């Protein structure tokens, strides 16, 4: 999506390949390295968890920073003056993963369950939903050969999503009554941008349902 929005190719293909390899290596290392070090040295459970968090959160977030720089450089080469909704969702998804991963790592160090909980919402809920919308807002209008149905709903889904807390993949956290009530309100309101984006994409696809159904990627994005 970023390449199509730019000059038809990524600003750096080498960057994309290298970051993909490093991301996979870090993910595998975070699972295997604590076990190997635990066999070689007398590591406590806390030290093993620290190593795992270091690889899973902090180091991987640096890899995503390189991805984000590549995406920004690619989009800067675009022919039109308008940055598409798909690219905005992609920017926000990458930024959410970067900051959320840091929140989770330092929250674990400080033993702050509230910081870890917020980091999980950023790196999981915000990131995943934003990436789904990024793909859908790029693929569906092209498959339907129609513009996005409602610009207002696009802006609503983009802005409100990152001011609320999507109620997905939740985990327990210690908090006072005020924070619990505030969290419940934000999780309830979070359904609005998701519904707005879903309706917007669905109505766009109905403009040319045959074209969307004939393309598996567009159909999958619509159903997602």
Show the residue positions of the predicted features.
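Alpha-helical transmembrane segments of polytopic membrane proteins
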Residues: 1, 52-63, 117-130, 181-194
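Juxtamembrane membrane-water interface segments of multi-pass membrane proteins
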Residues: 1-21, 36-50, 69-88, 103-118, ...
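Alpha-helical transmembrane segments of multi-pass integral membrane proteins
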Residues: 26-32, 62-66, 87-106, 129, ...
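General N-terminal targeting signals
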Residues: 54-57, 135, 141-142, 165-166, ...
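Catalytic cores of extracellular degradative/oxidative enzymes
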Residues: 97, 124, 139
């Amino acid at each position: 999506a970023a390449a199509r929005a730019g000059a038809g190719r990524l600003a750096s293909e080498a960057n994309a390949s290298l970051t993909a390899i490093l991301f996979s290596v870090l993910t595998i290392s975070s699972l295997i390295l604590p076990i190997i070090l635990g066999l070689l040295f007398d590591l406590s459970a806390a030290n093993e968890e620290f190593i795992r968090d270091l690889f899973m959160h902090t180091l991987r977030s640096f890899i995503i920073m390189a991805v984000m720089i590549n995406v920004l450089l690619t989009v800067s080469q675009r022919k039109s003056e308008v940055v598409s909704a798909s690219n905005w969702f992609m920017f926000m998804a990458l930024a959410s993963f970067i900051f959320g991963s840091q929140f989770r790592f330092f929250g674990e160090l400080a033993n702050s369950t509230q910081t870890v909980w917020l980091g999980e919402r950023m790196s999981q809920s915000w990131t995943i939903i934003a990436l789904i919308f990024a793909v859908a807002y790029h693929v569906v209008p092209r498959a339907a050969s129609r513009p996005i149905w409602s610009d207002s709903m696009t802006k609503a889904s983009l802005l409100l999503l990152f001011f609320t807390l999507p109620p997905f993949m939740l985990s327990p956290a210690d908090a006072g009554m005020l924070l619990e009530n505030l969290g419940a309100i934000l999780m309830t309101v979070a359904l609005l941008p998701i519904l707005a984006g879903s309706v917007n994409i669905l109505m766009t696809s109905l403009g040319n349902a045959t074209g969307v159904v004939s393309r598996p990627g567009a159909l999958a994005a619509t159903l997602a």
